[in-house]
Amino acid sequence: MSRVCGLTGAHGYVGSALRRGLTAAGWTVVSLSRREKVAEDEIRWSLDEASGSGPNTLREELRRREISAVVHAAWDLRLVRPSDLQRVNVQGSLRLLEEARAAGVRRFVFISTISAFDEAESDYGKTKLAVERAVALQGGVVIRPGLVYGERPGGMFGALKTQAGRGAIIPLLGNGRYAQYLVHEDDLAAAVVAAVSLEKAPERPVTVAHPEPRPLRSLMRQLAESQGSHPRFVSVPWPLVYQGLKVTEALGLKLGFRSDSVIGLVRHNRHPDLNASLLGVAPRPFTDPGREQTQRNSG
């Protein structure tokens, strides 16, 4: 079996961590990129484009490069309308799944989210769940990461850390007790490395996160203190924040935090199936790596 892996979202925060992990484990990584000009180790591909026809279809590129596994981590977070989410993220993912199947790719790994569960209320969770079901039907591996963090975090965790270090008074959603399950980027990468090598996919999604939840207020306080800040948190009713963000989105304004993310935080899965052991991974407990780096530099 070739050890060549196609990876979508390789230039994003999570995708970059997965690429480092796969490369360190001896895999050759080919990025499926939406960039206009792609490098030699990339294939031009986008969620919002059909796979194409003619001599240069995606399936033919996957075959030509002898790609044996595809890890799908791309997701367009700029979209807010449910119809756009369905058209781009869901249908684009299903096209990729079909192209990989037609190309004879042995293992398909979908990076979903801990926000995907049967009772999910966020559009993010519901659309990820729709793709999960299609991947499972074709024998793929579904990984549901918790809130991903690392030394130089991006994504939701990065946004929370930036917010926590901004000032003496910080608004906090509701009572701040909303549980957050976290996973270090290296532990998530280890789970993906294990997944691409599996002979048989697990029969259910694999949730990769440390089993001890952190209340949002506690997490924000720790992130603030790691940046030398000791803010006062002011509780703001989450529906007020949600409606305010909906208005800004309707006006086309981008604030770095989406209304749907509010739903994901407050309507979280209270009882996630924390089964990372299915992939031989034991996620580490949370410590802020940025603070550890500062301590090492000053030591």
Protein language model features and the residues they cover:
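Substrate-positioning beta->alpha
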Residues: 154-159, 174-197, 203-207
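SDR active-site strand-loop-helix element
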Residues: 8, 32, 70-74, 108-114, ...
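Flexible, glycine-rich beta-alpha linker
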Residues: 119-122, 143-159, 178-179
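Short alpha-helix in the Rossmann-fold core of NAD(P)-dependent oxidoreductases
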Residues: 86-93, 109, 128, 181
